[in-house]
């Protein structure tokens, strides 16, 4: 499973990922770790964790490759309004499991991911297990990203809205 953040903290679900990584069936790859975090989470202190800490990628291509290679993108955020990491995962054909936080649930539907209650790590782990056992179609993720979050279509809707407001 993949987690991506610009800055990793418990607000971004870091502690929950540590819990998930203690299950021998899970391998957790976290992208965006600082140098200090890479060193810390690679140390013997975390030897019971299946955790692979990675620094920020060098470009969008590297990041999209990581999303595309992942079975699942997990976003156990506690403090996001509408996280772009969910949209990035969908655009790369990767399913999303996220907490019911801010706009996270709006990015996905029942064909593209699962939403669990914020802070319920057991439900998060169960959703990961179920999705591994019964993967969803990656094409459904790409389709949702293109149909719902294409910037060209979104810009057109904004322009139409602004025009309707100025014509009143």
What is each PLM-predicted segment?
Residues 95-98:
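Short hydrophobic beta-strand element within catalytic cores of glycosyltransferases
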């Amino acid at each position: 499973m993949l987690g991506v953040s610009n800055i990793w903290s418990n607000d971004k679900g870091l502690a929950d990922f540590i819990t998930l990584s203690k299950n021998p069936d899970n391998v957790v790859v976290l992208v965006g770790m600082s140098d200090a975090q890479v060193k810390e989470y690679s140390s013997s202190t975390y030897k019971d964790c299946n955790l692979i800490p990675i620094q920020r990628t060098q470009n969008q291509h590297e990041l999209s490759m990581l999303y595309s290679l992942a079975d699942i993108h997990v976003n156990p955020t506690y403090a996001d309004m509408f996280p772009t990491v969910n949209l990035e995962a969908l655009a790369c054909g990767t399913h999303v499991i996220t907490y019911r936080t801010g706009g996270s649930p709006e990015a996905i539907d029942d064909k593209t991911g699962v939403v669990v209650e914020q802070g319920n790590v057991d439900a998060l782990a169960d959703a990961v297990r179920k999705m591994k056992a019964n993967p969803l179609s990656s094409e459904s993720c790409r389709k949702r990203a293109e149909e719902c979050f294409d910037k060209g279509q979104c810009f057109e809707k904004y322009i139409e809205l602004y025009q309707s407001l100025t014509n009143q």
